[in-house]
Regions:
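Non-cytosolic beta-sheet module surface loops
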Residues: 34-38, 121-123, 144
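Short, exposed coil/turn segments at beta-strand boundaries within extracellular/luminal domains
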Residues: 1-5, 84-91, 156-165
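Pro/Thr/Ser/Gly-rich low-complexity, intrinsically disordered linker/stalk tracts
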Residues: 6-37, 73, 90-115, 168-169
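Short beta-strand segments within Ig-like beta-sandwich modules, predominantly Fibronectin type-III
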Residues: 56-62, 135-141
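Extracellular recognition modules
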Residues: 78-82, 151-155
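Surface-exposed, short loops/turns at beta-strand junctions within beta-sandwich domains
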Residues: 68-75, 142-149
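Exposed beta-strand and adjacent loop surfaces of beta-rich binding modules
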Residues: 17, 29, 41-43, 76, ...
Length: 170
């Protein structure tokens, strides 16, 4: 018995691979891990609640993930993977997390073989931050999962610096 792909769209997805393996929304960022079924020649489009396109860029063929930053907390975004003619290959609505407290938090999680680091509850007067793993500066998406101390150095507009640190549990 061969199921009819027209009746079972999941059959096609299972055969060809999923477009998106993981989708993680933070407060100000969105992490998308692309599956085997993703068209790496596609274009990522992110629009806000008013329909304004805030991100439009080609996928990075070198990486199997995309990180979208500088989003607004507590906002619903329409995320789509488009062909070059703007035909929709995949779409979803994602709401960024709301700011829930007054104190900055350092969070990490493992997503599809990557360490995803999130800085939550950052106030508006933050000018920059650096994330370090065992003293070495890293990106907030990191392939190296072998570390012990994760640190964030948050610099405020008045020049003050705050250090957040956590021990990585295996």
């Amino acid at each position: 018995y061969n199921p009819n792909p027209l009746l079972y769209p999941d059959f096609i997805a299972a055969r060809d691979g999923l477009t998106v393996s993981s989708l993680v929304g933070g407060q100000r960022e969105l992490f998308i891990s692309w599956g085997n079924g993703a068209d790496k020649t596609g274009i990522l489009s992110v629009t806000d609640e008013e329909g304004t396109e805030v991100v439009r860029r080609s996928l990075d063929s070198e990486n199997d993930y995309t990180l979208v930053e500088n989003l607004a907390p507590g906002t619903t975004y329409h995320v789509a993977l488009l062909k070059s003619d703007d035909a929709v290959l995949w779409k979803d609505d994602v709401k960024t997390k709301s700011v829930t407290g007054k104190f900055p938090l350092l969070k990490y999680q493992q997503v599809d073989g990557y360490m995803l680091v999130q800085l939550l509850n950052l106030p508006d007067d933050v000018s920059s931050y650096k994330v370090k793993l065992d003293g070495q500066e890293i990106n907030i998406v990191n392939k190296n999962l072998n570390g012990q101390i994760l640190t964030a150095e948050v610099t405020y507009k008045d020049g003050s610096v705050e250090m957040l640190s956590t021990t990585i549990r295996k």
